[in-house]
Amino acid sequence: MEETTESIRLYGVLVPGIARPRAGGGYELIAGHRRKHGSERAGKTEMPIIVRNYSDDEATIIMVDSNIQREDILPSEKAKAYKMKYEAMKHQGKKSGKNTLDEVGEAARENAKKVQRYIWLSRLSDELLEMVDTKKLGFSQGVDISFLSEEAQQWVEVIIEEQGCNVSTVQSGKLKEYGKSGELTLAMVRLILTEEKSKERKVTLKADKISKYFSDSYSNEEIENIIISLLDKWREEGAV
């Protein structure tokens, strides 16, 4: 905000804001809120504005597009913005023949899948969204938890605060799975979030030890698939 304020103090507002007339008189600012705030801080009493008669849906889309590219935008802000724009575009009806998620993503240079995940994230409670903003809860974990009921989300928030635990993707995946089946209880949430995370075991196979089993015609992917296939067969035979 300091950079914006200083720029306005030196050069003024270079890009006009966008507003629309209010039914009861006056104007509603649609885009340019940061420029307005920067102007006030810089001691300016006026800023350039373009006035258009936009519908509610058009105003929502313009507002989202003007804010979504901010470098400092929080995950919660982006989630709510994408949801607002998606709903506004759906309300308008399809005009281009494209998927609405694709259209939302194109304007923000993100793919439809990422946009969908942000929209799911918007279903989190305000408390959990704040945890995502402050990186106390990961984005992917937040998306998983967004599938839970409001009550179950409250359980998750309380236990995270109580235990100070970091939720892994494995744990959030379990919460989502049990939540979908309707089997999730407070006790189960507590058990899942407080269970000791198993240490990931890494095994490295040296090339000189396995090269004698494969000719040069095999690619690395083919070798990996064969090894996995043999291990699956070994497990099925009761070796593990």
Per-segment meaning from a language model:
Residues M1-R52, M63-Q69:
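Short, charged/polar connector segments at secondary-structure boundaries
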Residues T4, R34-R35, T60, P75-K78, ...:
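Helical mechanochemical/support elements of P-loop NTPase systems and associated helical scaffolds
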Residues K174-L230:
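Charged/polar low-complexity intrinsically disordered segments, enriched in acidic residues
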Residues S229-V240:
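Short acidic DE-rich linear segments
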